[in-house]
């Protein structure tokens, strides 16, 4: 008992609490540490059992066991972790929350200058998380459930240190109004940059909508082979030409021979992507975007007419992103990691555990295996 810490110096009574903690297995056998803890009185928290140095408060596992399980959870799927550690996946989720709360860099929000904001779906039925990343470090530094302006308001009002919002110079985001509204309210000096990735995504989504419309029209015809071709052409149209397989190249060539609105939509998408692919100066990109918007207005494809109007409306923010070299491409790379985490975990039961795992893998958290220290 002499090795125990005493954060609460006043003993409450002579009763003890019989406690047990799961430790790292010994020779393939489950190892459990048992200890009788004194009850102490804290003026702020009431009667509590004394803390121990080898386990986190409220945990039934030792620090070494939790660190091992959480490290595995950042690398493996949940079934592997559950089987190897012989614990439930929900238990691993709680471990991740405790470890992240302890090891997350406390200075991650200090001195933020250029940030990226984006939302990602963590569960079906419109369950979203808003994630904020630091463009300088490439790490996710904050997250919260939801994707509205009020969600990002919490970042500025409660998460950032005092005057932290005043130091932010630029924020990259998608073209939706919610995040821009929050930034204008809390960091009016910051330049709003509409990420080129999301600009191209507008055209990509529009192209897929046109493909669906053509497919639905073809289904009504007697020749079902035509409908099958359109249905299977999704990735041939959406992927970059240099990434196509031989089969997809053949499908795309067939569509080009047939012509029509779908091919025009594909050419519009590719021409917009080409604007941001090369290392062009701002004036050239602005000129190319203006010509593209004019083309979109004349194309007689309703979805692309709308895309052209949207780009024209947000042209200042797109120019700002190009001038500052800010794009959510790195943030989208983080989002791809997040999507992999969600797939690997087969979903999460609550947003807290989802955020903990995201911060564990993509945030400023340093993890070490217990026997490597």
Indicate where each model-derived feature is located:
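Catalytic cores of large soluble enzymes that bind and process phosphate-bearing ligands
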Residues: 34, 57, 61, 73, ...
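Basic, low-complexity intrinsically disordered segments
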Residues: 19-31, 41-43, 97-169, 184, ...
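Core catalytic machinery and nucleic-acid-binding channels of phosphodiester-processing enzymes
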Residues: 36-37, 84-95, 136, 175-177, ...
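Short, positively charged, Gly/Tyr-enriched micro-motifs
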Residues: 3-8, 12-126, 166, 181, ...
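A short local loop/turn or secondary-structure capping micro-motif enriched for an aromatic residue
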Residues: 11-12, 149-152, 202
């Amino acid at each position: 008992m002499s090795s125990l810490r005493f954060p609460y110096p006043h003993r409450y009574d002579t009763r003890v609490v019989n406690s047990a903690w799961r430790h790292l297995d010994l020779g393939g056998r489950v190892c459990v540490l048992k200890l009788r803890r004194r009850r102490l009185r804290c003026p702020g928290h009431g009667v509590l059992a004394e803390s121990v140095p080898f386990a986190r408060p409220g945990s039934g596992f030792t620090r070494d066991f939790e660190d091992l399980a959480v490290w595995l959870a950042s690398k493996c799927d949940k079934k592997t972790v559950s089987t190897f550690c012989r614990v439930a996946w929900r238990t691993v989720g709680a471990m991740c929350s405790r470890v992240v709360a302890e090891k997350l860099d406390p200075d991650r929000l200090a001195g933020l200058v250029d940030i990226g904001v984006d939302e990602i779906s963590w569960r079906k039925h419109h369950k979203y998380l808003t994630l904020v990343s630091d463009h300088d470090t490439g790490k996710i530094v904050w997250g919260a459930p939801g994707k509205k302006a009020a969600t990002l308001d919490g970042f500025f009002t409660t998460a950032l240190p005092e005057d932290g919002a005043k130091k932010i110079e630029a924020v990259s985001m998608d073209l939706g109004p919610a995040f821009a509204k929050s930034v204008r309210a809390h960091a009016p000096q910051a330049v709003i940059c509409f990420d080129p990735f999301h600009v191209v995504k507008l055209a990509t989504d529009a192209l897929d909508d046109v493909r669906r419309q053509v497919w639905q029209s073809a289904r009504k015809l007697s020749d079902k082979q035509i409908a099958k071709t359109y249905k299977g052409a999704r990735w041939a149209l959406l992927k970059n030409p240099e990434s196509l397989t031989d089969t997809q190249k053949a499908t795309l060539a067939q569509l080009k021979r047939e012509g029509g609105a779908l091919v025009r939509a594909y050419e519009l998408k590719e021409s917009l992507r080409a604007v941001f692919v090369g290392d062009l100066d701002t004036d050239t990109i602005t000129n190319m975007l203006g010509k593209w918007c004019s083309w979109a207005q004349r194309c007689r494809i309703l979805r692309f007419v709308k895309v052209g109007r949207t780009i024209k409306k947000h042209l200042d923010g797109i120019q700002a992103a190009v001038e500052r070299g800010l794009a959510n491409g790195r943030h989208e790379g983080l989002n791809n990691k997040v999507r992999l985490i969600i797939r690997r975990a087969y979903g999460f039961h609550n947003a807290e555990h989802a955020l903990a795992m995201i911060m564990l893998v993509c945030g400023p958290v340093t993890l070490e295996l217990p026997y490597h220290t």
